[in-house]
Amino acid sequence: STAAVTTIEYEQGVLSDLRRALSVVAPDDIPYAHDRRWGDGNGRSHVKAALVGPSLSVPIAGGEPMLGTWQQVVLLELDVRRERSRTVVVTVTP
């Protein structure tokens, strides 16, 4: 629950802007109830992931995703304190 899926122009400026925006909403330097309860220090990561969301719908036309010219689907891991693996599930419905 610390990962999120979205679309973004995968470019350093936009990535920096997103990082800054999420830090305004869920700053690193405030206490989180989750951290007090579990002691794992990633409360902010759970909040950021909840705001971005765990899923995404992308329309398909002619067998291709309908994305903007520079738009890409990305998985954001918002708790980078340790290495982990993630499984991405893609479901196509007619």
Predicted regions and their residues:
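Active-site histidine-anchored catalytic micro-motif
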Residues: 1-94
